Swiss-Prot record:
Monomer. Interacts with DnaB. Signal peptide: none annotated. GO terms for cellular component: cytoplasm; DNA-directed RNA polymerase complex; primosome complex. It comes from Ureaplasma parvum serovar 3 (strain ATCC 700970). A zinc finger (CHC2-type) spans 39-63. The gene is dnaG. GO terms for biological process: DNA replication, synthesis of primer. Mg(2+) 1 binds at residues 272, 317. This is DNA primase. Pfam families: DNAG_N (PF08275), Toprim_2 (PF13155), Zn_ribbon_DnaG (PF01807).
Amino acid sequence: MSKITNNVFLTIRNAINISDVIQNYIKVIKKGNNYWAICPFHNDTNESLSINDKKQIFKCFACNHAGDVIKFVAEYKKISYALAAQEIVQLMNLDLNLLNHLQKISPQEIKKNKVFDLNKQIQKWFINFLNNKNNIHVIDYLTKRNLNKNDLAYFKIGYAPNNDELLNLIKSNYNNLIQENDEFELNKLIENSFLVIDKNGNYHDFFNDRIIFSIYDHLNNVVGFSGRIITNEKTPKYLNTKTTAVFKKDEVLYNFHNVITIENNHQLFIVEGFMDVITIHKSNKPNVVATMGVELTNKHLELIKSYGIKDLILCFDNDQAGFLATKKQIMKLINSPFNIFIVNHKDNDCKDMDEYANKHGYSATSKLLDQQLHISEFLLLEISNTNKSTPSLKHSYKQECFTIIKKYGDIFYVDKYVDFMKQTFSIEENLLKKVIEELLINKQCNSIQNKKNIQSYQKQTQLTNKLTTSNPKVILTKIDKHFNHLVVIILMNRVFLNRLDTQVRNRLTKEQSLVINIIEDFYLYHFKINNILKNTDSFIEFINKNYSKYTNVINQLTKMVQIIKYNPKFDNIVAFELAKNNFIYEWLNNQIKRLKLINLNLNMNNNQEQIINNEKLIKQYNDEKILLDNLINASLFHKNQ
C-alpha cells in the first residue's frame, strides 16, 4: 500500500469504533467487553464473529475470517478497499478531506486487491493438493513432524506437487479465471512466484514438491507463500515468494494476523522459522511470530507497537548463529520502547524449539519458554566467561558488570544482579545491593527529569514545609502511596505505561490493576493524547461512561486529576511525582551514588576512616531525601483548605 493510503486507512481506523460501523451491516450484540454477531462470511448459525473495539478488529472463531473495519466492509460488500474506506467516511460523517485523499489513490491499489484474490485462490488449490489421496505421503511426513489436522487448518498449510500440477490446473481453469481476475495473466503469475519460464520459453511451477506455508499481512490478506522441501536436499530448504508490491519480508511477520486477535495480550515471542511458530503455538503460547530469516526492522517494530505489544521475547536458534542473531537483535532493540527478554535455552542439546518439543514434549517446552532472561541478565551471562585471573582483569570485569547493569538494567531485577555478582566478588551483600539500587534509580531519574527540574531543586524544597504541614488525606485509599506515585507519572505521560512489563503487572493488587487498565484504555481510545493531566475533562468523561460501576475508584481518580490540575502548587512540583521504589530526585541520588561507589572501593581496601567520613555525608543527603519524600507524598495527598 502507498504511504498516503496507509495514512488515510490508519486515520479512519483510529477515528471510529469498528462495532459502530459493522452494526450498520449486520446485527451485533454486546457480551462482556466485545460485540458478537453471526458471521456473514460462512454459513454461520451461532454468534461466532467477535468484534473488538479496543484492537479495532473482527474475527470469526468458526471460519477464522479476520481483519479491520475496512476489510470487513470491502469483503461484505465485495468492493475494493478504497471504495470501502470512502463508504465508511460517508457513513460515519468523518472529515470529507479523507475522501479527496481516497479518490487520489492510484489504480495500483485496486490491482493489489486483485493480487490478494489471486493468492487466496491458489492457496485453496495448495490446500486441495495436500488433501488429495495421491499425496498421502505428504500427510504422513507432516504427521511425523507432529502436525495434526487442526494445525494444518489453523495455519492454512498446503502442498505444491511435482510435475507442474499447478500449471495444469491453471490452464484447465484459465478461461474462467481470466474473466474473474485479470491477474491470472501469465506474466502476473510469474511476477507473483507461481510460475517460472525456462530458457526455451516453457512455463513450469515455481514451487515443486514442497510444503506450502501461507503468509498473511496484519489485515488478514494472503500476501505470499513459503515452500519447504520434503526430499530433495540439493535445493534450498525454503523457497519464498519474491518481493512484490504486496509481499515485503521487512514489513510482514508470519502469524501476526493471528496474534492480534488474542485478548489482552502484551507479549510477543519472536522466532526464526515457521515450525518454531507452530511448536510454540502448540505449547500454549499462541502469541508468537517468525521473522522469516530477516532481522526485525523498524517497520516490524512500528506494526508491533501499534497493537499495544510491550514485551518482546526473543527465542532464536540455540546455536552459534542463533546466539549471534540474538545479540545483533538486542543491540537494535536496546533503545526501543519495548521490554526485551530472551528465552533461556540453558545447555540443552536441541537447535530450536521444534527439536526441543519433539524430544521433551509440549508441556516441557511451555516451561522452557517461561524461563526468560531480562536483556541485562543475558548480557551479564555473556561476559561471565571473561578472564578474571589477575586483580586487574577482575577489576575490569567488575566495572564491565556495573556498566551493563547501569546501562541496561532494571530496578526490578536488583536481587538477580546481586546474586550474580556476589558469586564472583567478595563484596558485602547489603552494600552491593545498595550500590546497584542507586545506579538504577539514578538511571531512571535521568530518563524522566530534565535539567530545568534539577536546577530548580532548591526552589522546590522551600515549598516542603508549607505542603507537609497540611492534614493529608489519601486520594486512593486502598492503593499504597508508592503506587500513587506511579499513577501520577502515568497520568503525566503515556510512555511510562511501557515500563509496566508483565512481571510488574502480576504484582499489582486487583484494584491497582483496575486503575492501570482504566488509564491504559483511555490512552488506547484517545491515541493522540499523551498527557491525561492536560486532558482531564476527556478523561473524567471517559471513565464515568465506561467504568461507572466502579464508583469508589472512579471518584478517587477524578479527585486526583482535579487536584493536580487545579492546585497551582502542582505546576511547580509535578515533576517530583515519582514512584518511590523506582524514581527519586536525581541530584540527591547522584551524590549518594558517588559516595557509595567510593565506599565500595574503600571497603575493599579497608580504608575505614574515609568510609566513616563518607557515611556522614551520606546521612546528610539522606536527611535531605526525607524532606524530598515529604514533598513527594504531599503532592499526592489532598491538602485540606
